[in-house]
């Protein structure tokens, strides 16, 4: 099943005089797009919000509230990009909030540095929390995960593999958490022990499990020699062709 995601960067650089009319136009335009018809058994449609962007610092038409209400009333998906919110907000907290009302969600997993910079995804705390919320809420089949990052200053193949593996590690780490035991402690109000057990879980043997996963998949943990070889043979030839032109 494919996912068609709609993100529209309409907005204004400075304070608007009318915040409603552009949103009415966007609502009606999206209705016209969806009215063209599509096979819902084969396609999921999602809408993606953003808090602000370059050139639209003061007002974004497709805000979080707009798209959550639009998706809920049209029976489509919300797509959450963890670089599209205020730095004090976390997508890991938004996932269970939306799962209380939506039967499916979509994600753009990225790594923002101070803003929506789309740095290469790394195995960091928020990525682990996103994975935990998906796993502990039995939402693996409900959440469509896409990666959203780029960095032209580094080898693109290495960036691709690093980000993919970071997400896989986070999901594996979430799968080995004692989720039921932790949930039980919370429900019983045993918050001191809950804190202790969650802290202990940070040192679960992810490394050994990750290496075993790679072994079963027939790939190695250290892939960088292959990246170097690809860089020397394929990318260098491509660069020579571009230079010649």
What are these regions, as identified by a protein language model?
Residues 1-77, 180-181:
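Active-site acidic/histidine proton-transfer and metal-coordination neighborhood
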Residues 1-3, 21, 35, 41-43, ...:
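Alpha/beta catalytic barrel-like cores
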Residues 73-77, 99-105:
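Glycine-enriched alpha-helix->loop->beta-strand junction motifs that scaffold or abut catalytic
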Residues 84:
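Short, glycine/acidic-enriched loop or turn micro-motifs at the edges of active sites
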Residues 91-92:
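Acidic catalytic motifs of isoprenoid enzymes
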Residues 95-96:
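Glycine-rich, phosphate-binding/catalytic loops in enzymes
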């Amino acid at each position: 099943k494919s996912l068609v995601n709609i993100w529209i960067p309409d907005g204004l650089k400075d304070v608007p005089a009318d915040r409603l009319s552009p949103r009415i136009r966007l609502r009606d335009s999206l209705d016209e797009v969806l009215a063209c018809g599509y096979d819902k058994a084969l396609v999921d449609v999602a809408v993606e919000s953003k808090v602000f962007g370059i050139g639209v610092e003061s007002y974004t038409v497709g805000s979080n509230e707009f798209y959550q209400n639009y998706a809920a009333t049209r029976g489509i998906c919300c797509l959450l990009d963890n670089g599209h919110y205020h730095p004090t907000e976390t997508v890991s907290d938004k996932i269970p909030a939306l799962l209380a009302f939506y039967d499916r969600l979509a994600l753009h997993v990225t790594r923002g540095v101070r803003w929506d910079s789309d740095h290469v995804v790394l195995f960091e705390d928020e990525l682990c929390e996103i994975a935990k919320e998906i796993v502990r809420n039995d939402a693996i089949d409900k959440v469509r995960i896409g990666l959203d990052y780029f960095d032209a200053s580094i080898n693109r193949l290495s960036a691709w593999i690093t980000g993919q593996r970071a997400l896989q590690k986070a999901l594996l780490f979430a799968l080995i958490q004692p989720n039921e035991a932790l949930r039980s402690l919370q429900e019983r109000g045993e918050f001191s022990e809950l804190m202790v057990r969650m802290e202990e879980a940070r040192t679960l043997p992810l490394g050994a499990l990750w290496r075993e996963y790679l072994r079963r998949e027939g790939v190695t943990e250290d892939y960088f020699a292959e990246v170097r070889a690809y860089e020397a043979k394929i990318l260098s030839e491509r660069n020579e062709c571009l230079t010649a032109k």
